[in-house]
A protein has these predicted regions:
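Active-site metal-binding loops of divalent metal-dependent hydrolases
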Residues: 17, 179-180, 228-229
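Short glycine-rich phosphate-binding loop at a beta-alpha junction
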Residues: 58-69, 164-176
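Short hydrophobic/aromatic-enriched beta-strand-loop microsegments
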Residues: 34, 85-96, 194-202
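Active-site-proximal alpha-helix that buttresses catalytic centers in soluble enzyme cores
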Residues: 2-88
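Phosphate-handling substructures
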Residues: 82-152
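Alpha-helical packing segments of well-folded alpha/beta enzyme cores
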Residues: 42-46, 73-76, 142, 146-157
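Conserved histidine-centered catalytic loops in small-molecule metabolism enzymes
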Residues: 4, 57-97, 120-125, 211-231
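Acidic, low-complexity terminal tails and accessory targeting/binding regions
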Residues: 1-10, 46, 56, 82, ...
Length: 231
Protein backbone atom coordinates (compact mmCIF):
# COMPACT_ATOMS: atom_id res chain seq x y z
CA UNK A 1 0.00 0.00 0.00
CA UNK A 2 1.17 3.54 -0.65
CA UNK A 3 2.16 5.63 2.38
CA UNK A 4 0.42 8.77 3.59
CA UNK A 5 3.14 11.09 2.21
CA UNK A 6 3.02 9.66 -1.30
CA UNK A 7 1.93 12.96 -2.88
CA UNK A 8 5.45 14.36 -2.39
CA UNK A 9 7.98 12.84 -4.81
CA UNK A 10 10.29 10.30 -3.20
CA UNK A 11 13.66 8.82 -4.09
CA UNK A 12 13.98 5.17 -3.13
CA UNK A 13 17.57 3.99 -2.76
CA UNK A 14 18.08 0.24 -3.15
CA UNK A 15 21.32 -1.47 -2.24
CA UNK A 16 22.25 -4.59 -4.18
CA UNK A 17 22.01 -7.93 -2.43
CA UNK A 18 24.88 -9.77 -0.81
CA UNK A 19 27.97 -10.83 -2.79
CA UNK A 20 30.90 -12.94 -1.63
CA UNK A 21 32.92 -9.80 -0.99
CA UNK A 22 30.03 -8.22 0.90
CA UNK A 23 30.14 -11.24 3.21
CA UNK A 24 33.89 -10.88 3.68
CA UNK A 25 33.91 -7.11 4.14
CA UNK A 26 36.10 -6.51 1.09
CA UNK A 27 35.99 -3.16 -0.68
CA UNK A 28 34.20 -3.80 -3.97
CA UNK A 29 34.14 -1.20 -6.70
CA UNK A 30 34.59 -2.13 -10.35
CA UNK A 31 34.99 -5.89 -9.79
CA UNK A 32 32.05 -7.71 -11.34
CA UNK A 33 30.44 -10.05 -8.81
CA UNK A 34 27.04 -11.72 -8.88
CA UNK A 35 24.73 -12.01 -5.91
CA UNK A 36 25.06 -15.01 -3.63
CA UNK A 37 22.05 -17.29 -3.14
CA UNK A 38 21.35 -15.42 0.10
CA UNK A 39 21.72 -12.13 -1.76
CA UNK A 40 19.03 -13.20 -4.22
CA UNK A 41 16.73 -14.12 -1.32
CA UNK A 42 17.35 -10.75 0.34
CA UNK A 43 16.22 -8.85 -2.73
CA UNK A 44 13.31 -11.19 -3.43
CA UNK A 45 12.10 -10.65 0.14
CA UNK A 46 12.33 -6.90 -0.24
CA UNK A 47 10.48 -7.03 -3.55
CA UNK A 48 7.65 -9.19 -2.22
CA UNK A 49 6.95 -6.81 0.67
CA UNK A 50 7.72 -3.39 -0.81
CA UNK A 51 7.48 -3.42 -4.62
CA UNK A 52 4.23 -3.73 -6.53
CA UNK A 53 0.87 -2.13 -7.17
CA UNK A 54 -0.29 -0.29 -4.05
CA UNK A 55 2.94 -1.04 -2.19
CA UNK A 56 5.66 1.34 -1.02
CA UNK A 57 7.38 1.31 -4.42
CA UNK A 58 4.50 1.27 -6.87
CA UNK A 59 5.78 0.88 -10.44
CA UNK A 60 2.89 3.02 -11.66
CA UNK A 61 4.28 5.94 -9.62
CA UNK A 62 7.91 5.51 -10.74
CA UNK A 63 8.99 7.85 -13.52
CA UNK A 64 12.72 7.06 -13.60
CA UNK A 65 15.05 4.34 -12.34
CA UNK A 66 18.82 4.86 -12.25
CA UNK A 67 20.81 1.63 -12.05
CA UNK A 68 24.55 1.27 -11.56
CA UNK A 69 26.03 -0.56 -14.57
CA UNK A 70 27.72 -3.12 -12.30
CA UNK A 71 26.34 -6.64 -12.72
CA UNK A 72 25.26 -6.98 -9.08
CA UNK A 73 23.15 -3.82 -9.31
CA UNK A 74 21.52 -4.87 -12.58
CA UNK A 75 20.73 -8.27 -11.08
CA UNK A 76 19.16 -6.55 -8.09
CA UNK A 77 17.04 -4.32 -10.33
CA UNK A 78 15.78 -7.35 -12.25
CA UNK A 79 14.75 -9.08 -9.02
CA UNK A 80 13.05 -6.00 -7.59
CA UNK A 81 10.93 -5.37 -10.68
CA UNK A 82 10.50 -8.88 -12.09
CA UNK A 83 6.73 -8.82 -11.47
CA UNK A 84 6.25 -5.43 -13.12
CA UNK A 85 6.26 -4.19 -16.69
CA UNK A 86 9.57 -2.36 -16.13
CA UNK A 87 12.72 -3.94 -17.58
CA UNK A 88 16.28 -2.79 -18.22
CA UNK A 89 15.39 -1.75 -21.77
CA UNK A 90 12.45 0.36 -20.60
CA UNK A 91 12.47 4.09 -21.31
CA UNK A 92 12.16 4.63 -17.56
CA UNK A 93 15.44 2.83 -16.79
CA UNK A 94 18.93 4.25 -17.26
CA UNK A 95 22.26 2.59 -16.54
CA UNK A 96 23.95 5.47 -14.75
CA UNK A 97 27.72 5.78 -14.26
CA UNK A 98 27.22 8.63 -11.80
CA UNK A 99 25.95 6.17 -9.14
CA UNK A 100 28.61 3.48 -9.54
CA UNK A 101 30.46 2.42 -6.42
CA UNK A 102 33.40 4.49 -5.15
CA UNK A 103 36.47 3.66 -7.26
CA UNK A 104 38.71 2.02 -4.67
CA UNK A 105 41.83 2.07 -6.83
CA UNK A 106 44.63 0.00 -5.30
CA UNK A 107 42.34 -0.91 -2.38
CA UNK A 108 39.99 -2.95 -4.55
CA UNK A 109 39.32 -6.29 -2.88
CA UNK A 110 41.11 -5.32 0.34
CA UNK A 111 39.77 -5.41 3.87
CA UNK A 112 39.69 -2.19 5.83
CA UNK A 113 42.30 -3.59 8.21
CA UNK A 114 44.61 -4.36 5.27
CA UNK A 115 44.26 -0.83 3.91
CA UNK A 116 45.08 0.76 7.25
CA UNK A 117 48.06 -1.56 7.85
CA UNK A 118 49.49 -0.86 4.38
CA UNK A 119 49.18 2.89 4.80
CA UNK A 120 50.83 2.79 8.23
CA UNK A 121 53.72 0.73 6.85
CA UNK A 122 54.29 3.38 4.18
CA UNK A 123 54.30 6.24 6.65
CA UNK A 124 50.83 7.55 5.89
CA UNK A 125 48.16 8.55 8.42
CA UNK A 126 50.61 9.53 11.15
CA UNK A 127 47.97 11.67 12.84
CA UNK A 128 45.12 9.14 12.77
CA UNK A 129 43.52 6.22 10.96
CA UNK A 130 42.60 6.28 7.29
CA UNK A 131 39.01 7.22 6.49
CA UNK A 132 37.62 6.80 3.01
CA UNK A 133 35.22 9.68 3.68
CA UNK A 134 38.09 12.14 4.17
CA UNK A 135 41.08 10.53 2.45
CA UNK A 136 39.62 8.70 -0.53
CA UNK A 137 41.48 5.87 -2.24
CA UNK A 138 44.99 5.77 -3.71
CA UNK A 139 44.79 5.43 -7.51
CA UNK A 140 41.02 5.65 -7.12
CA UNK A 141 38.52 8.40 -6.41
CA UNK A 142 38.81 11.25 -3.97
CA UNK A 143 35.83 12.42 -1.90
CA UNK A 144 35.68 15.49 -4.13
CA UNK A 145 35.35 13.39 -7.29
CA UNK A 146 32.58 11.26 -5.78
CA UNK A 147 30.81 14.40 -4.59
CA UNK A 148 30.93 15.96 -8.06
CA UNK A 149 29.34 13.02 -9.83
CA UNK A 150 26.66 12.43 -7.19
CA UNK A 151 25.74 16.11 -7.26
CA UNK A 152 25.22 15.82 -11.02
CA UNK A 153 22.82 12.92 -10.51
CA UNK A 154 20.96 14.71 -7.72
CA UNK A 155 20.52 17.71 -10.01
CA UNK A 156 19.00 15.43 -12.68
CA UNK A 157 16.59 13.95 -10.14
CA UNK A 158 15.48 17.34 -8.85
CA UNK A 159 14.87 18.53 -12.41
CA UNK A 160 12.57 15.51 -12.86
CA UNK A 161 10.69 16.07 -9.60
CA UNK A 162 10.57 19.88 -9.40
CA UNK A 163 7.36 20.29 -11.50
CA UNK A 164 5.45 17.78 -9.36
CA UNK A 165 6.17 18.76 -5.76
CA UNK A 166 2.47 18.91 -4.84
CA UNK A 167 1.52 15.62 -6.42
CA UNK A 168 0.51 17.02 -9.81
CA UNK A 169 1.45 13.59 -11.11
CA UNK A 170 3.51 10.68 -9.70
CA UNK A 171 7.24 11.43 -9.82
CA UNK A 172 8.99 8.80 -7.72
CA UNK A 173 12.58 7.88 -8.62
CA UNK A 174 14.47 4.69 -7.76
CA UNK A 175 18.26 4.43 -7.51
CA UNK A 176 19.74 0.90 -7.48
CA UNK A 177 23.38 0.87 -6.50
CA UNK A 178 25.96 0.14 -3.80
CA UNK A 179 26.45 0.50 -0.06
CA UNK A 180 29.15 3.15 -0.14
CA UNK A 181 27.87 5.21 -3.07
CA UNK A 182 24.33 5.24 -1.68
CA UNK A 183 25.45 6.42 1.74
CA UNK A 184 27.41 9.16 -0.03
CA UNK A 185 24.27 9.91 -2.03
CA UNK A 186 22.24 10.40 1.16
CA UNK A 187 24.81 12.83 2.56
CA UNK A 188 24.88 14.86 -0.63
CA UNK A 189 21.06 14.79 -0.89
CA UNK A 190 21.00 16.50 2.50
CA UNK A 191 23.80 18.89 1.51
CA UNK A 192 26.40 17.41 3.86
CA UNK A 193 30.09 16.87 2.99
CA UNK A 194 31.10 13.23 2.73
CA UNK A 195 33.34 13.45 5.77
CA UNK A 196 30.53 14.65 8.02
CA UNK A 197 30.30 12.14 10.90
CA UNK A 198 26.83 10.84 10.08
CA UNK A 199 26.70 7.08 10.66
CA UNK A 200 24.38 5.42 8.13
CA UNK A 201 23.45 1.75 7.78
CA UNK A 202 22.01 0.19 4.62
CA UNK A 203 21.87 -3.59 4.61
CA UNK A 204 22.30 -5.64 1.42
CA UNK A 205 18.97 -5.73 -0.39
CA UNK A 206 17.56 -2.88 1.72
CA UNK A 207 15.51 0.15 0.70
CA UNK A 208 16.00 3.71 1.97
CA UNK A 209 13.72 6.68 1.35
CA UNK A 210 14.49 10.33 0.60
CA UNK A 211 12.04 13.11 -0.10
CA UNK A 212 11.33 16.78 0.66
CA UNK A 213 9.88 18.68 3.62
CA UNK A 214 6.63 20.56 3.02
CA UNK A 215 6.61 19.80 -0.72
CA UNK A 216 9.61 22.13 -1.07
CA UNK A 217 12.38 21.25 -3.53
CA UNK A 218 14.73 23.41 -1.42
CA UNK A 219 14.19 21.24 1.67
CA UNK A 220 15.52 17.76 0.82
CA UNK A 221 14.91 15.29 3.63
CA UNK A 222 15.61 11.74 4.80
CA UNK A 223 12.70 9.59 6.01
CA UNK A 224 13.57 8.39 9.51
CA UNK A 225 10.13 6.78 9.83
CA UNK A 226 6.99 6.51 7.76
CA UNK A 227 3.33 6.05 8.61
CA UNK A 228 1.13 3.74 6.56
CA UNK A 229 -2.62 3.78 5.98
CA UNK A 230 -4.76 1.05 7.58
CA UNK A 231 -5.24 -2.25 5.78
Amino acid sequence: MADLDASTPRVFIARHGETEWTKNGRYTGSTELELTADGVKQVEGTASHLVGSGKLIDPARVVQIFVSPRKRAQQTFNLLFKDSDISLDSDRVKLEEEITEWDHGMYEGWLGSEIRASRKERGLDKDGDWSIWADGCEDGESPEQVTERLDRLIAKIRDIQRPHMNGEKPADVVVVAHGMSLRCFVKRWLGYPLDMPLALMLSPGAIGILSYLKHDIKQPAFFVGMSLPPL
